[in-house]
Design a protein with these regions (language model features):
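Hydrophobic beta-strand positions that form the internal "hydrophobic ladder"
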Residues: 57-60, 110-113, 159-162, 209, ...
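A flexible loop/linker signature enriched in serine peptidases of the S9 family
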Residues: 64-78, 94-101, 114-131, 139, ...
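Residue-level detector of Asp-centered blade-edge/turn motifs that repeat once per structural unit
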Residues: 55-56, 108-109, 157-158, 204-205, ...
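A short helix->beta-strand "capping" segment at the edge of beta-propeller domains
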Residues: 32-46, 90
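Bacterial N-terminal signal peptides
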Residues: 14-26
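Short loop/turn segments that connect beta-strands within beta-propeller blades
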Residues: 83-86, 134-138, 178-183, 247-251, ...
């Protein structure tokens, strides 16, 4: 008899498939009457998501979103499953009824995870804070208590820092906390500027953070929306965005792109930390806002050591896929 060894990376897709089947199967087959599935049936399915294997390959976190069709709401909790034990080992980690726990992320040593939740938000607001929990259970501990809540977060690759984005919409900035003092340390603000941070990611060496930021904040648009004038303006003039990097040791910030014909929309860093690729959308008013399908966007390659930029594509009314 032959046995095959399945690695954690290979087990992850299989576990996800089983979890999807588990979410769909909500009652014993013997108690169900066979009939065509309806649109409402689909809407009432519990949905798994946010699959996050631990770095040591032992566990996987995931979320289950349970809809309430009549109230037009859904509620999300976090679950944990052993990569070796499979579905029978799955257990629920959070148990709120009216609040949501989402976006679980493991610490680099797999000893705990952090997630976002609105469990302690005022009734009139829906802002997320960050919480700490160990895989063996216990009550979650609150990490942040920031006025505007946390938009997103990520651990540094060396596991020493937890960074998060927070602030008023359009003015969000980046902050970091030391992992060895999450509950008592004051967060360091690592970016500042008149416009908020959009997409961002840690550098592989954990010494810097790359991010996209608009050149300025559109105050006219802010005032319009504050006055409840929310009619969309066709082909509105909007700020361009560029790629930046902040060096955490020197606390210096450097702009990496300033192309006259491209506004940066998203980017990726190479695994060796030598390169960045980014998408540059057209800066022409009637090309950049006419569609969200990236018909006038191109791929660029940035050498980080020299800051030399090479344009890789010449698109015109052609949308690219990932």
């Amino acid at each position: 008899m032959q046995f095959s060894v399945v690695s954690p990376a290979q087990r992850t897709p299989m576990l996800i498939s089983v979890l999807l089947l588990m979410a769909v199967t909500t009652a014993p087959l013997s108690a169900q009457t066979q009939r065509p599935m309806t649109f409402l049936d689909v809407q009432e399915l519990a949905r798994p998501g946010s699959w996050t294997p631990s770095p040591d390959g032992q566990w996987m976190l995931y979320t289950i979103s349970t809809p309430d069709w009549q109230e037009d709401t859904s509620q999300v909790d976090i679950h944990l499953v052993s990569m070796s034990g499979g579905l029978p080992s799955s257990r629920q980690m959070t148990f709120t009824t009216d609040d949501n726990e989402s976006s679980p992320q493991w610490s680099r040593d797999s000893s705990f995870f952090v997630f976002a939740s609105d469990r302690d938000a005022p009734v009139t607001e829906s802002v997320n804070q960050l919480y700490f929990m160990r895989p063996d259970g216990g009550e979650a501990r609150q990490i942040t208590n920031v006025e505007k809540g946390v938009a997103d977060f990520a651990f540094s690759f060396d596991g020493t820092w937890l960074a998060y984005r927070s602030g008023e919409v359009g003015l969000e900035q980046l902050y970091r906390l030391p992992v060895d003092d999450l509950f008592l340390a004051d967060a360091d603000q690592v970016t500042d500027g008149e416009a908020g941070i959009e997409d961002w990611t840690w550098a592989r060496d954990s010494q810097s953070i790359y991010f996209i930021r608009q050149n300025f904040r559109d105050e006219d648009d802010v005032r319009r929306r504050e006055e409840n004038f929310t009619v969309d303006i066709k082909n509105a003039v909007t700020p361009f965005s560029n790629l930046w990097v902040t060096d955490l040791a020197s606390q210096s910030v450097r702009q990496l792109t300033n192309l006259p014909d491209a506004s940066v929309t998203d980017f990726e860093l190479s695994l060796d930390g030598q390169w960045a690729t980014f998408v540059g959308g057209s800066t022409e008013r009637y090309e950049r806002n006419i569609t969200a399908s990236r018909l006038y966007a191109d791929q660029y390659l940035l050498e980080l050591s020299t800051e030399h930029i090479e344009r890789l594509t010449e698109n015109f009314e052609i949308a690219e896929s990932d």
